């Protein structure tokens, strides 16, 4: 780890800034402000630093490199091979050698010439860089799920609101036509009052890293600062099966299929429910009042120990029931809203409705401008973030929305662990009358890391 910035001093400054304001309800929205000295203007290129440039981080880097009105100035990654490859890619794109390389993300965040950061680290490394970036006056693009624990998400929302930052989550489905059309169908009342939503997620474990789950512990690859990679998670021996890409299958660093996908399909479910007619609350405050769940888990000490199958039932206000399931064939992958007048189902590359003519009507009305409730049509997920950094307008997936979208996943996991139904106060963001479950809203971070 780099020595020119004190880890303890840096973290202390984050903690002091975070403690300056008590945590607030995520339903409180503040208008993003432009602090004095922010470099970006309507005519300037937005200058970005990328933290984490592995699998998804590499894809996000490519997206920003393809945008003419932004410039990637710096890369941070604890894996030297990822870092070097990304820096070379940036320099080749701009045909110069201007991209700075850092192992320590804290050095990147302190740069005064950066307007924004893109955080594409594993789940356990979202909250600390995000809060630090917000406190440093940076706007933030961050991967989903928003946070490794629910309480980390609350702290992230508070930091972004207090500092008036623009935030975009990597829940890119909101920037796609099929998902927008489906949510518009629901919000425009084609189904009547929605009574049930089915959210189908993948199950099991996908071997994205190509390692399988039976390799023995060993030494980390050359050029990897494994202590820094583990960071606030609990120290575990290095094992290639729970490293790049496959870290998501161990609860120390990820949240399994449930949390890997909750920020996609449950996010879309909430988007459809965000109309006042359903009584579930606005998009940035919607949430369940009761959650019950069952799940199948490998052994706790297994290399991959996240749930392989899960079924979560959530009661929302105004008699709306939301089912989130993985491994149950009757719950089709994607998002399906059901009401007395019919249903609509959407997944990647697919939209269907009980009345196919509805889809044609929505498309025609959207085109003509006659749609009563018209949702924002994104120019592209990364482009919209860049545009919002300049305009200071909220994005499609601000931090408040991301937090509410992931909440049923966190609560569903907790309910499956304690084995009982949870009562949830969505306004106060507290579990009611269950001390054991409440403890699972957060994790102890490995010293010296803390929020």
Residue ranges of model-derived segments:
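N-terminal secretory signal peptides and thylakoid transit peptides that target proteins
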Residues: 1-18
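C-terminal helical cap and adjacent loop that interface with cofactors, partners, or active-site loops
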Residues: 13-17, 33-35, 59, 237-240, ...
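N-terminal Rossmann-like dinucleotide-binding module
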Residues: 17-94, 173-176, 269
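A structured beta-alpha segment of the ubiquitous adenosine-cofactor-binding alpha/beta core
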Residues: 94, 98-119
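Beta-strand-loop-alpha-helix segment that lines the small-molecule cofactor/substrate pocket
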Residues: 122-123, 127-175, 189, 419
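Basic phosphate/pyrophosphate-binding loop/patch that engages nucleotide-derived ligands
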Residues: 159-164, 181-194, 217-220
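Core domains of carbohydrate- and sulfate-ester-processing enzymes
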Residues: 198-242, 442
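Rossmann-like dinucleotide-binding domain that binds NAD(P)(H)
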Residues: 219, 227-317
């Amino acid at each position: 780890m780099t020595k020119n910035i004190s880890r303890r001093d840096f973290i202390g400054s984050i903690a002091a800034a975070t403690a300056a304001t008590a945590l607030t309800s995520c339903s409180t929205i503040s208008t993003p402000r432009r602090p004095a000295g922010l470099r970006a203007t309507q005519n300037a290129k937005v200058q970005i630093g990328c933290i984490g440039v592995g699998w998804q981080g590499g894809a996000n880097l490519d997206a920003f490199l393809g945008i003419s009105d932004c410039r990637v100035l710096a890369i941070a990654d604890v894996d030297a091979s990822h870092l070097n490859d990304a820096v070379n890619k940036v320099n080749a794109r701009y045909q110069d050698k201007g991209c700075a390389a850092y192992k320590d993300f804290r050095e990147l965040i302190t740069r005064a010439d950066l307007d924004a950061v893109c955080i594409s680290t594993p789940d356990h490394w979202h909250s600390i860089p995000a809060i630090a970036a917000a406190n440093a006056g940076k706007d933030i693009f961050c991967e989903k799920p928003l946070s490794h624990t629910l309480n980390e998400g609350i702290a992230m929302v508070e930091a972004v609101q207090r500092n008036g930052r623009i935030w975009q989550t990597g829940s890119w489905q909101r920037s796609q036509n099929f998902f927008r059309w489906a949510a518009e169908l629901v919000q425009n009342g084609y189904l009547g009052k929605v009574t049930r939503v089915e959210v189908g997620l993948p199950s099991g474990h996908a071997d994205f890293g190509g390692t399988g789950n039976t390799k023995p512990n060993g030494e980390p690859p050359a050029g990897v600062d494994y202590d820094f990679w583990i960071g606030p998670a609990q120290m575990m021996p290095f094992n290639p099966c729970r490293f790049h890409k496959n870290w998501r299958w161990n609860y120390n660093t990820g949240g399994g299929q449930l949390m890997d996908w909750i920020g996609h399909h449950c996010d879309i479910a909430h988007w459809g429910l965000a109309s006042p007619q359903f009584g579930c609350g606005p998009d940035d405050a919607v949430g369940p009042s009761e959650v019950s769940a069952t799940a199948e888990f490998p052994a706790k000490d297994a290399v991959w120990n996240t749930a392989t199958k899960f079924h979560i039932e959530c009661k929302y206000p105004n008699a709306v029931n939301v089912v989130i399931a993985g491994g149950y064939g009757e719950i089709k992958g994607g998002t399906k809203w059901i009401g007395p007048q019919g249903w609509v189902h959407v997944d990647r590359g697919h939209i269907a409705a009980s009345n196919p003519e509805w889809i044609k009507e929505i498309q025609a009305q959207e085109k003509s401008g006659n749609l009563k409730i018209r949702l924002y049509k994104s120019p592209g997920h990364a482009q919209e973030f860049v545009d919002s950094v300049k305009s200071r307008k909220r994005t499609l997936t601000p931090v408040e929305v991301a937090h509410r979208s992931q909440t049923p996943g966190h609560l569903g996991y907790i309910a499956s662990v304690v084995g009982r139904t949870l009562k949830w106060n969505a306004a106060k963001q507290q579990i009611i009358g269950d001390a054991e479950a409440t403890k699972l809203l957060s994790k102890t971070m490995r010293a010296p890391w803390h929020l």
